[in-house]
């Protein structure tokens, strides 16, 4: 199930492997418990979501934001794309930013039209992303990985005073996210000639 897949993603990230997964709708909801752990442990995973309606009084396979909005509080940064070309261009931004900031990302797009649309796109070579990759951040991530050579304790129980301090200590990582995303979007814009920014004003 998706719950098991989320556990596998969490375990894989704990051992220093850069990991991603894809899901939608009810499947995303099953990942929520592990999403809290992944975000709380500052593991740079990425979940790609074709955003869809949730089954309530009936099942619906059409696009909606019910699933991703149910995950706002998990600690994952959220990046939305609105076309097949944007998915191509900005999925890489989600990965690059997650690695550089140690904050996991949820990259989502319309779960009916965009996810199933047959469209010509300009594909970027992986070398573009490779040149933008923060190798020091990858090294730091791998050095924090669980290994028999350097055992550590994780997932302990904390009293409220220590728990609060460790939660607050993560703010510096989250505060860096907007600038890092903007920087990577600017670099992707230079390569593609398509303008990207975290927020665009219309009106």
Model-derived features: where do they sit?
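Metal-ion/cofactor- or nucleotide/acyl-coenzyme-handling active-site neighborhoods
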Residues: 68-72, 119-122
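Conformationally flexible catalytic loops at phosphate/diphosphate-handling active centers
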Residues: 105-200
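Thiamine diphosphate
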Residues: 1-70, 76-99
């Amino acid at each position: 199930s998706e719950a098991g897949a989320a556990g596998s993603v969490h375990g894989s990230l704990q051992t220093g492997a850069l990991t991603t997964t894809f899901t939608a709708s009810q499947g995303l909801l099953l990942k929520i418990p592990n999403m809290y752990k992944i975000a709380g442990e500052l593991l740079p995973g990425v979940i790609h979501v074709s955003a869809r309606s949730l089954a309530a009084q009936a099942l619906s396979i059409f696009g909606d934001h019910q699933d991703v909005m149910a995950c706002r509080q998990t600690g994952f940064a959220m990046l939305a794309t609105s076309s097949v070309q944007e998915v191509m261009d900005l999925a890489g931004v989600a990965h690059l930013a997650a690695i550089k900031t140690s904050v996991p990302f949820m990259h989502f797009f319309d779960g009916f039209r965009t996810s199933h649309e047959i469209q010509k796109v300009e594909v970027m070579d992986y070398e573009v992303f490779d040149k933008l990759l923060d190798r020091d951040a990858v090294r730091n991530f791998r050095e924090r990985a669980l290994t028999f050579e350097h055992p550590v304790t994780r997932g302990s129980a904390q009293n409220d005073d220590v728990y609060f301090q460790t939660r607050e200590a993560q703010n510096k990582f989250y505060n860096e996210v907007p600038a890092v995303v903007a920087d990577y979007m600017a670099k992707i814009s230079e390569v593609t000639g398509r303008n990207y920014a975290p927020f665009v004003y219309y009106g």
